[in-house]
């Protein structure tokens, strides 16, 4: 079962924007050694928007091979074109992914019926577990709870990453779906509360730099130990906040360089973290106990 702390993995690059396979392997090993429950490759944090289709497949294949079945590998395969999303999802299945994460179509702003038909078509076209991903702050399109509940009965659609941070919405989804449908947070600050409501885990940016702590948080919350889970969350709150001082994944990539886990590299139109944010991120790493 897919549950717990699922890292939204960055895609390491060099100064010229070329994929850095050595650092990617190091990051996968870092998560395997520190209790991460699943890896989400080539999602938003993995800069999927600026990877070619060939690179997309190569990253999934690399991560699947490195993980070697020890934890699930989930591939980001969403697109604002239904046919492209089918193509990416089939590629991810062929590359060995355990499941796919499909973001709500961005820019073209489909209706709720359009969203239903989009995700239903992909689920019927490719036989692989699929997780919906609602993040209206990035897509400018908000999938309502009623649409999620409707999609929850479609074969191959197994869950949703709900990244709004709206706990009332999360509860409405949880109340309307079967117990087998996985509701996950995509918002680090509120993830603990969503899990305590009945969610199954968190697809996390913070887990890139604090995998052990995020795994402990999710495990405590899944066990119903609210006091322990909230205490860990409070310690991680500086990271939850300051890893978004600029657009994700800019700050978290800077943090990983500071930790010695990868080299400096990002693709335009994203740029490296501005100097005014450097100390914010370093301070958050120290306050959360990641750096001393």
Curated annotation (Swiss-Prot):
List of catalytic residues = 133, 161
GO MF annotations in UniProt = 4-hydroxy-tetrahydrodipicolinate synthase activity
Please give the pathway this protein is involved in: Amino-acid biosynthesis; L-lysine biosynthesis via DAP pathway; (S)-tetrahydrodipicolinate from L-aspartate: step 3/4
Q: Which reaction does it catalyse?
A: L-aspartate 4-semialdehyde + pyruvate = (2S,4S)-4-hydroxy-2,3,4,5-tetrahydrodipicolinate + H2O + H(+)
Q: What is its EC number?
A: 4.3.3.7
| Keyword Lyase on entry | yes
BP terms from Gene Ontology: diaminopimelate biosynthetic process; lysine biosynthetic process via diaminopimelate
SUPFAM superfamilies linked to this entry: Aldolase (SSF51569)
Known function: Catalyzes the condensation of (S)-aspartate-beta-semialdehyde [(S)-ASA] and pyruvate to 4-hydroxy-tetrahydrodipicolinate (HTPA).
Q: How does it assemble?
A: Homodimer.
Q: Which family does it belong to?
A: Belongs to the DapA family.
Identification of the protein by name: 4-hydroxy-tetrahydrodipicolinate synthase
Q: What gene, per UniProt, encodes this protein?
A: dapA
């Amino acid at each position: 079962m897919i549950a717990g702390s699922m890292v939204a993995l960055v895609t390491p690059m060099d100064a010229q924007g070329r994929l850095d396979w050595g650092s990617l392997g190091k990051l996968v090993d870092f998560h395997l050694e520190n209790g991460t429950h699943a890896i989400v490759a080539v999602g938003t944090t993995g800069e999927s928007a600026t990877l070619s289709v060939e690179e997309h497949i190569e990253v999934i294949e690399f991560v699947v091979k490195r993980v070697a079945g020890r934890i699930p590998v989930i591939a980001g395969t969403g697109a604002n074109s239904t046919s492209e999303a089918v193509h990416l999802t089939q590629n991810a299945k062929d590359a060995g992914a355990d499941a796919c994460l499909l973001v709500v179509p961005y820019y073209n702003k489909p209706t709720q019926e359009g969203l239903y038909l989009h995700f239903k078509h992909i689920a019927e076209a490719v036989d692989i577990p699929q997780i919906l991903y609602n993040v209206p702050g990035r897509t400018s399109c908000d999938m309502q709870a009623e649409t999620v509940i409707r999609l929850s009965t479609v074969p191959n659609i197994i869950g949703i990453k709900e990244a709004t941070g709206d706990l009332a919405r999360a509860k409405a989804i949880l109340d309307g779906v079967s117990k087998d449908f996985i509701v996950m947070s995509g918002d680090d600050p509120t993830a603990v509360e969503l899990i305590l409501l009945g969610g199954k885990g968190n697809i996390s940016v913070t887990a890139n730099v604090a995998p052990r702590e995020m795994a402990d948080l999710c495990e405590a919350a899944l066990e119903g130990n609210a006091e322990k889970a909230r205490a860990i969350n409070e310690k991680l709150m500086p990271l939850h906040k300051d890893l978004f001082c600029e657009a994700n994944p800019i700050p978290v990539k800077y943090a990983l360089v500071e930790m010695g886990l990868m080299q400096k590299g990002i693709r335009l139109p994203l740029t490296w973290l501005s100097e005014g944010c450097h100390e914010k991120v370093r301070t958050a790493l120290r306050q959360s106990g990641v750096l001393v």
